[in-house]
Swiss-Prot record:
HAMAP family: dCTP_deaminase. The keyword Hydrolase applies. This is dCTP deaminase. It comes from Pectobacterium atrosepticum (strain SCRI 1043 / ATCC BAA-672) (Erwinia carotovora subsp. atroseptica). InterPro entries: dCTP_deaminase, dUTPase-like_sf, dUTPase_trimeric. Residues 169-193 are annotated as: Disordered. Catalyzes the deamination of dCTP to dUTP.
Length: 193
């Protein structure tokens, strides 16, 4: 059962759930908290790689990722990031989120943006118990027109679901947690699997 607005506010008030900066009441709906777009992005560079062998030797996968992913792009305030049709880009939420070990979060895109072709997450919308950091957004433009995305715009909504008990292996205590304390648009770390 997901938390309702009253429960979200209670969890925020007593510090079990932390969202920084804390969202005002107007951004907390019946079962969700609206999140905004941050100013950090990462895209695929122009490259000549025919493919990335995801099950190949780790050093080759790592080198391929290094060749195709851009450095982090920090957008100045007021500027737009343009996502063209058929393009994938990574970005982050403006808000940082800290979940306790007995709560899982879910990220959903906004219907109004989806109706223009914008996917906010390609597949990864679960936020693990014990997570701490900003949420990476996996943007894909499936529409026909370029989309101008501006830092600070409402980009998605988080919902929260209590677990049956505390997780034995929350994200913040896992040795293999590849994105622990993530603050920027971190590229894939599939080579760390």
């Amino acid at each position: 059962m997901r938390l309702c607005d009253r429960d979200i506010e209670a969890w925020l008030d007593d510090g079990r759930l932390v969202i920084t900066p804390r969202p005002p009441t107007e951004r907390i709906s019946g079962a969700t908290v609206d999140v905004r777009l941050g100013n950090q992005f990462r895209v695929f560079r122009g490259h000549t790689a025919a493919f990335i062998d995801l099950s190949g030797p780790k050093d080759e996968v790592s080198a391929a990722l290094e060749r195709v992913m851009s450095d982090e792009i920090n957008l100045p305030e007021g500027e737009a990031f343009f996502l063209h049709p058929g393009e994938l880009a990574l970005a982050v939420t403006l808000e940082s989120v800290t979940l306790p070990d007995n709560l899982v979060g879910w990220l959903d895109g906004r219907s109004s943006l989806a109706r223009l072709g914008l996917m906010v997450h390609v597949t990864a919308h679960r936020i693990d118990p014990g997570w701490q950091g900003r949420i990476v957004l996996e943007f894909y433009n499936s529409g026909k027109l370029p989309l101008a995305l501006r830092p600070g715009m409402m980009i998605g909504a988080l919902s929260f679901e209590p677990l049956s008990g505390p997780a034995a292996r929350p994200y913040n205590r896992r040795q293999d947690a590849k994105y622990k304390d993530q603050q920027g648009a971190v590229a894939s770390r599939i080579d760390k699997d």
